[in-house]
């Protein structure tokens, strides 16, 4: 999935986080599978004033988010517009504050995740009536609801994956759930 990121003047520094959520199937930390790669492209220059992405060196080998220390120092990326950083979803990082009065910091993040996190086949053949008899969890499993990562693994607004207009896809479609199957009555 992808996201356009815009940090305006006065944007605060983010909290330390990983882009790879803590899925029950794919955990973060050493000796675990890579579950996400982020192709992070700067659309504007990332400077000390507009804010640079900070990484905790070696954090992909730790289970906990942790804080920077002597063995895991902070590394800043000073990207120019058009530069792309490719990083593991396990890397602990954050965006720095934008201290400028009038400059926006913009980026494009394209995340690659394994196909095991999505339905194998398209489910467009399932009627809306049938989908509305399902629970919200079942609707997620057939791609008719957004998958939202629960706290504490979210950063800011919990937008999720597979959204419509940056909102939960089922709500945007007016999708109901747990409806009786009228055909069986």
From Swiss-Prot:
UniProt binding sites for Fe cation: 17, 19, 93
UniProt keyword list: Alkaloid metabolism, Dioxygenase, Iron, Metal-binding, Oxidoreductase
Gene Ontology MF annotations: dioxygenase activity; metal ion binding
Name of the protein this chain belongs to: Dioxygenase easH
Source taxonomy: Eukaryota, Fungi, Dikarya, Ascomycota, Pezizomycotina
Subunit: Homodimer.
Family of the protein in this entry: Belongs to the PhyH family.
Gene3D superfamilies (UniProt xref): q2cbj1_9rhob like domain
Cofactor: Fe cation
GO biological processes: indole alkaloid biosynthetic process
Pathway note: Alkaloid biosynthesis; ergot alkaloid biosynthesis
Function: Dioxygenase; part of the gene cluster that mediates the biosynthesis of fungal ergot alkaloid ergovaline, the predominant ergopeptine product in E.festucae var. lolii. DmaW catalyzes the first step of ergot alkaloid biosynthesis by condensing dimethylallyl diphosphate (DMAP) and tryptophan to form 4-dimethylallyl-L-tryptophan. The second step is catalyzed by the methyltransferase easF that methylates 4-dimethylallyl-L-tryptophan in the presence of S-adenosyl-L-methionine, resulting in the formation of 4-dimethylallyl-L-abrine.
Enzyme Commission identifier(s): 1.14.11.-
Main EC class the enzyme belongs to: oxidoreductase
Induction info: Strongly expressed in planta but weakly expressed in axenic culture.
